[in-house]
């Protein structure tokens, strides 16, 4: 299955220096040894910690400050009918210059103050970013499957990923910002050739998908029903 227009990528888009973004102190989310990669257990505890200890900070103050982890809902789009996934490439017009020309499995972005007015901030941020980034005529279901931390890159050191597996009820998906992104859907086997050109987060997620993340999603502690994004 191919997407109907070029596609999206890692949720570090909308880089507005004056925006406030949801952060949590690094020492709070990692009270002991800092781990690297994906964690698939204890997600309920992580959600409780984020809800209790996070706060909004000016983005320009935390963009290069690894003591504060910017919370990023990170959506992997999966079509279960043919077992394909959305993979994208960030173009030069993308706001996140550190990720230009890299491939990604994820779509999403920062959590802003308005996201917590009607919903849990993480849920509100997820729903808003889905509407802003994706064109999807059908409803979709998002399930939290992992927490992601990656310290080997400047981008990774200041962001904390909440990885959601998102499955549309039907039909193709596309992205709105086609001047920033391009992409298509394909099987994991077909996208293997892009692995070395993927963002580090996407490499970790790719490995987890091969290890069975879709089957694990049924036990997710957080399930969000996303409305159509026409």
PLM region spans:
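Short, extreme N-terminal leader segments that mark the start of a protein/domain
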Residues: 2-38
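Nudix hydrolase/Nudix homology domain
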Residues: 3-13, 28, 100-114, 146-230
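A short catalytic or substrate-binding loop motif that flags glycine-/basic-rich loops and adjacent residues
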Residues: 15-16, 66-70, 156-158
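Short hydrophobic/aromatic beta-strand or adjacent loop that forms the aromatic wall/cage
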Residues: 19-21, 72, 159-163
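Short, flexible beta-strand-to-coil junctions
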Residues: 25-29, 78-82, 168
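Acidic, metal-coordinating catalytic segment for phosphate/diphosphate chemistry
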Residues: 36-82, 90-94
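A short coil-to-beta-strand element that immediately follows conserved catalytic motifs
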Residues: 137-146
């Amino acid at each position: 299955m191919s997407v109907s227009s070029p596609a999206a990528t890692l949720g570090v888009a909308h880089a507005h220096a004056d925006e406030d973004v949801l952060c949590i102190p690094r020492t709070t989310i990692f009270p002991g040894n800092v781990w690297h990669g994906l964690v698939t257990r204890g997600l309920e505890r992580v959600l409780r910690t984020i809800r209790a200890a996070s706060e909004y900070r000016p983005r320009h103050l935390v963009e290069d400050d690894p003591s504060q982890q910017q919370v990023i809902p990170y959506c992997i789009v999966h079509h279960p009918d043919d077992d394909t996934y959305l993979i994208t490439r960030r173009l030069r017009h993308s706001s996140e210059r550190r990720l230009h020309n890299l491939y990604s499995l994820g779509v999403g972005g920062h959590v802003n103050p308005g996201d917590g007015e009607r919903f849990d901030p993480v849920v509100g941020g997820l729903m808003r970013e889905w509407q802003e980034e994706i064109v999807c005529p059908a409803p979709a279901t998002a399930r939290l499957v992992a927490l992601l931390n990656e310290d080997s890159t400047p981008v990774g050191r200041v962001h904390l990923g909440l990885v959601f597996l998102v499955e549309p009820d039907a039909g193709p998906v596309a992205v709105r910002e086609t001047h920033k992104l391009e992409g298509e859907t394909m099987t994991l086997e077909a996208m293997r050739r892009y692995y070395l050109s993927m963002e580090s987060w996407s490499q970790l997620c790719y490995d987890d998908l091969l290890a069975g993340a879709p089957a694990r999603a049924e036990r997710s502690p957080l399930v969000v029903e996303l409305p159509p994004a026409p």
